[in-house]
UniProtKB/Swiss-Prot annotation:
Compartments, as annotated in UniProt: Secreted
Phylogenetic placement of the source organism: Eukaryota, Metazoa, Chordata, Craniata, Vertebrata
Protein name, entry field: Carboxypeptidase A2
Stretches assigned to the Peptidase M14 domain: 120-412
InterPro entries: CPA_M14_CPD, M14A-like_propep, M14A_act_pep, Peptidase_M14
Top-level lineage group: Eukaryota
Enzyme superclass (EC): hydrolase
Length: 417
């Protein structure tokens, strides 16, 4: 066992230059507003290099923060001095990363000459190869649309599911934040589900006889590759700009939806950096241009992780959208359908009230463009693993998410506008 762990650690060093040995994820539940303000001040202390996986919002809501080993004692002493209770959610982040890397390498060996394993995490190259396989195996149903290239010149490939004709469309994307690996895996499983079950599953057949589906499994390909090869905790794009040594923009703060407002940072080194202007990121602009040119997209759905949430506009402001009642009803039904499979509970509501105010988000942009059915999923889990969800949870996550997606898609089909 010791040799196995040593090998895994060595492989982690080779494949992922930045290690997180001794880093801990703390769970904090602030009890009042003063503690919220204190945690927000702590978040602003850049020298501590804290990574807030779940930021402070309101009293009683859980906060998760990854604390580098070098800052652990200082942070714990500070929390105790302020009377803020905490517990350790992840004892050593690197242990989970080593296990994750070992599982990926084992799966790569197992897949050689065999079938694609949808219950494993994959490289970008492997994902793109499987997308090509789906197109080749389903020529009358699935095609590949290239939106262009990422900042580092990787293709942005979309799968189009269509039975022909000029139909209204549903847009579904995943992986806009690089480190949220379960979203890319869920999207690819969903693509296979749609392709495999058309013609035999009445629900999928009915949907595709009425609607086209455009699915982008990896919205941020550069960030995804970087998260696998260099820094597992990477969130942003990989764009570079003169005058700053910090790399990347938060692509879900870069849309033209109250750009630069609350919940987005003007600091290029922040994980929530909104970028120099709306749509500055080629990955965002490519989607914007495609959606606008298509002209008949009726639903815009994006997959994130984690926290088990199903949200709709608005994020950039805390007022209800005009279609609040309908969006809330659809989301509640989708969450109920999802829960029936494995008992996974989702919280439902507008972004601003469910998590926090955040400007420049994709579904706010889509809704303001006139795409009424705009939703964001935050997939599993709520604690324990955070962004490092074990591969064994990919399948149940994808299966239950599909039930929520299907509920939304059926509503879109039955309520044309």
């Amino acid at each position: 066992m010791r040799l196995t762990l040593l090998l895994a650690a060595l492989l982690g060093y080779i494949y992922c230059q930045e290690t997180f040995v001794g880093d801990q994820v703390l769970e904090i539940i602030p009890s009042h507003e003063e503690q919220i303000r204190t945690l927000l001040q702590l978040e602003a202390e850049e020298h501590l290099e804290l990574d807030f996986w779940k930021s402070p919002t309101i009293p009683g809501e859980t906060v998760h923060v990854r604390v580098p080993f070098a800052s652990i004692q200082a942070v714990k002493v500070f929390l105790e001095s302020q009377g803020i209770d905490y517990s350790i959610m992840i004892e050593d982040v690197q242990v989970l990363l080593d296990q994750e890397r070992e599982e990926m390498l084992f799966n790569q060996q197992r897949e050689r000459g065999g079938n694609f394993n949808f219950e494993a995490y994959h490289t970008l190259e492997e994902i793109y190869q499987e997308m090509d396989n789906l197109v080749a195996e389903n020529p009358g149903l699935v095609s590949k649309v290239n939106l262009g290239s990422s900042f580092e010149n990787r293709p942005m490939n979309v799968l189009k599911f269509s039975t022909g004709g000029d139909k209204p469309a549903i847009w579904l994307d995943a992986g806009i934040h690089a480190r949220e690996w379960v979203t890319q895996a869920t999207a690819l499983w969903t693509a296979n589900k749609i392709a495999s079950d058309y013609g035999t599953d009445p629900a999928i057949t009915s949907l595709l006889n009425t609607l086209d589906i455009f699915l982008l499994p990896v919205t941020n390909p550069d960030g995804y590759v970087f998260s696998q090869t260099t820094n597992r905790m990477w969130r942003k794009t990989r764009s570079k700009r003169s005058g700053s040594g910090c790399v990347g923009v938060d692509p879900n703060r870069n849309w033209d939806a109250n750009f630069g407002g609350p919940g987005a940072s003007s600091s290029p080194c922040s994980d929530s950096y909104h970028g120099p202007k709306p749509n500055s990121e080629v990955e965002v602009k490519s989607i914007v241009d495609f959606i606008k040119s298509h002209g008949k997209v009726k639903a815009f759905i994006t997959l994130h992780s984690y926290s088990q949430l199903l949200m709709f506009p608005y994020g950039y402001k805390c007022t209800k959208p005009d279609d609040f009642n309908e969006l809330d009803e659809v989301a509640q039904k989708a969450a109920q359908a999802l829960k029936r499979l494995h008992g996974t509970s989702y919280k439902v509501g507008p972004i601003c009230s469910v998590i926090y105010q955040a400007s420049g988000g994709s579904i706010d942009w889509a809704y303001d463009l006139g795409i009424k059915y705009s939703f964001a999923f935050e997939l599993r889990d709520t604690a324990f693993y955070g962004f490092l969800l074990p591969a064994k949870q990919i399948l149940p996550t994808a299966e239950e998410t599909w039930l929520g997606l299907k509920t939304i898609m059926e509503h879109v089909r039955d309520h044309p506008y």
